[in-house]
């Protein structure tokens, strides 16, 4: 009797896929810190990292050495258990969310029928990590930063979910692969769901706390916000987690609005991973370009923009989409 039954083999393959995907995401997140500094230097007419290795290519190695060997100090006035748990929860929630992203027709960690709901569950979990970090630090700037972050995240996640309901109404499924295949047979959702794309992208920038929505970390006001007391690997987990969030939102934009692994007009379908990676890289560069070109607004302007502009626009988009779907549905087929 062998242990390698078909079920065991399937489980081993699933574990290997999960490890490969998660390691690739972590490595890409670490590399993005170097890529961002080089691109910002290029766009701002300066050099950027150029001291460690040829063209500064080994800067990431220097950053990692510093992160690994810097003292992992915990303030004596902090709640040590929650203080340590916060960065672990933050990074774990982002990594687990990648489980529902279909990279190619055959590569993906999990094919869940509730893929979109699973993503929002993990996105909501990351809010607790930020609150844990701010409260457990026992620092007024950290607490204010965490309160800003949680309020901003909750505000933008409201219409972030509604922005995708138009897609769900058209496809009739929360499954990511079903959404990709629907786009392969019809138009990419960037065309019929353009306003949903705009609001989801704005919400994605806000949820990842990226410029211009980096209010929770505003250096001029909050001295780096909720991770002011963190150092060493704990700070590194927050730092790399921010770039992992960028990759996650970019991959979701590609999957939900730009046909996933399909190329334009289904050109070269055998290059599924290439198309997915190329489109994801484009949105990652767009995240970085926003940081280089747009000033940071006031916090009240950020919140007003969410509730007074984005939410009504998302509701209108959902109502119009639902009306069109109902009008195009044959009589008697609506259940």
Curated annotation (Swiss-Prot):
Localization per record: Cell inner membrane
Membrane topology, from the record: Multi-pass membrane protein
Disulphide connectivity of cysteines: none
EC number: 7.1.1.-
GO molecular function: NADH dehydrogenase activity; oxidoreductase activity, acting on NAD(P)H, quinone or similar compound as acceptor; quinone binding
Pfam families, alphabetized: NADHdh (PF00146)
Any single Gene Ontology cellular-component annotation: plasma membrane
Catalytic activity: a quinone + NADH + 5 H(+)(in) = a quinol + NAD(+) + 4 H(+)(out)
Main location: membrane
Swiss-Prot/TrEMBL keywords: Cell inner membrane, Cell membrane, Membrane, NAD, Quinone, Translocase, Transmembrane, Transmembrane helix, Ubiquinone
Segments passing through the bilayer: 12-32, 81-101, 114-134, 154-174, 187-207, 238-258, 270-290, 307-327
Major enzyme class: translocase
GO terms (BP aspect): aerobic respiration
Primary role: NDH-1 shuttles electrons from NADH, via FMN and iron-sulfur (Fe-S) centers, to quinones in the respiratory chain. The immediate electron acceptor for the enzyme in this species is believed to be ubiquinone. Couples the redox reaction to proton translocation (for every two electrons transferred, four hydrogen ions are translocated across the cytoplasmic membrane), and thus conserves the redox energy in a proton gradient. This subunit may bind ubiquinone.
NCBIfam families associated with the record: PRK06076.1-1, PRK06076.1-2
HAMAP family, sorted: NDH1_NuoH
Similarity section: Belongs to the complex I subunit 1 family.
Oligomeric and partner information: NDH-1 is composed of 13 different subunits. Subunits NuoA, H, J, K, L, M, N constitute the membrane sector of the complex.
Protein name as catalogued: NADH-quinone oxidoreductase subunit H
Organism: Pseudomonas syringae pv. tomato (strain ATCC BAA-871 / DC3000)
């Amino acid at each position: 009797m062998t242990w390698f039954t078909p079920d065991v083999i399937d489980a081993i393959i699933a574990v290997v896929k999960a490890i490969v995907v998660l390691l690739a995401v972590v490595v890409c997140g670490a590399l993005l810190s170097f890529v961002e500094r080089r691109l910002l230097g290029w766009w701002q007419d300066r050099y950027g990292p150029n001291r460690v290795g040829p063209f500064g290519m080994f800067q990431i190695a220097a950053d990692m050495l510093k992160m690994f060997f810097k003292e992992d100090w915990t303030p004596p006035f902090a709640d040590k258990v929650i203080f340590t748990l916060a960065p672990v929860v933050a990074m774990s929630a982002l990594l687990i969310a990648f489980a529902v992203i279909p990279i190619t027709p055959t590569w993906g960690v999990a094919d869940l029928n509730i893929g979109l709901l699973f993503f929002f569950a993990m996105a909501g979990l990351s809010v607790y990590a930020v609150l844990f970090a701010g409260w457990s630090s026992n620092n007024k700037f950290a607490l204010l930063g965490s309160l800003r972050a949680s309020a901003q995240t909750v505000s933008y996640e409201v219409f972030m979910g509604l922005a995708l309901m138009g897609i769900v109404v058209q496809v009739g499924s929360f499954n990511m692969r079903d959404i990709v295949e629907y786009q392969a047979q019809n138009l990419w959702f960037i065309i019929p769901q353009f306003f949903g794309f705009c609001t989801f992208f704005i919400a994605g920038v806000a949820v990842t706390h990226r410029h211009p929505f980096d209010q929770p970390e505003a250096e001029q006001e909050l001295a780096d916000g909720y991770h002011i007391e963190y150092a060493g690997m704990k700070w590194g987990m927050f730092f790399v987690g921010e770039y992992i969030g960028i990759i996650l939102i970019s991959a979701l934009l590609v999957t939900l609005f730009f046909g996933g692994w399909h190329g334009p007009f289904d050109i070269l379908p055998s290059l599924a991973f290439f198309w997915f990676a190329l489109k994801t890289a484009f949105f990652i560069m767009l995240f970085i370009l926003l940081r280089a070109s747009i000033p940071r607004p006031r916090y009240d302007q950020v919140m007003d923009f969410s509730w007074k502009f984005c939410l009504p626009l998302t509701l209108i988009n959902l109502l119009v989409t639902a009306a069109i779907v109902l009008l195009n549905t044959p009589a008697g087929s609506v259940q």
